[in-house]
């Protein structure tokens, strides 16, 4: 399921899988800003129920999020990864799916779409 909301200054897209065991959200600003670093949009809140992890749900949700971003004109998408708060398999997942660190000091990972 995909829900799209257009706000005053951004588009927000919520994607949930068919079984309602995972979801992801995208924020696309409607103005030129450096708020997202070098990305045109930001993925946040990618979540999969603990009992359904490592079954491909997160990858499908991430691919759908990237597809929706492309449909809305996004060329570069980013997400924040906090080493102190997340397991290392999460970082490996994003790197495997084409995300690269913006720089050594930043928690921002980016991907060209």
Residue ranges and their predicted role:
Residues 1-44, 104:
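Acetyl-CoA-dependent GNAT
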Residues 29-31, 51, 84-86:
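Short coil/turn motifs at secondary-structure junctions
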Residues 44, 49, 82:
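Residue-level recognition of the GNAT/N-acetyltransferase active site
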Residues 48, 54-67, 92, 96:
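Conserved acetyl-CoA-binding loop-helix of GNAT-fold acetyltransferases
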Residues 70-71:
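Residue-level signal for alpha-helix termini/capping positions
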Residues 78-91, 110:
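Conserved beta-strand-loop-alpha-helix junction that forms the acyl-donor binding cleft
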Residues 94-104:
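Conserved acetyl-CoA-binding loop of GNAT-fold acetyltransferases
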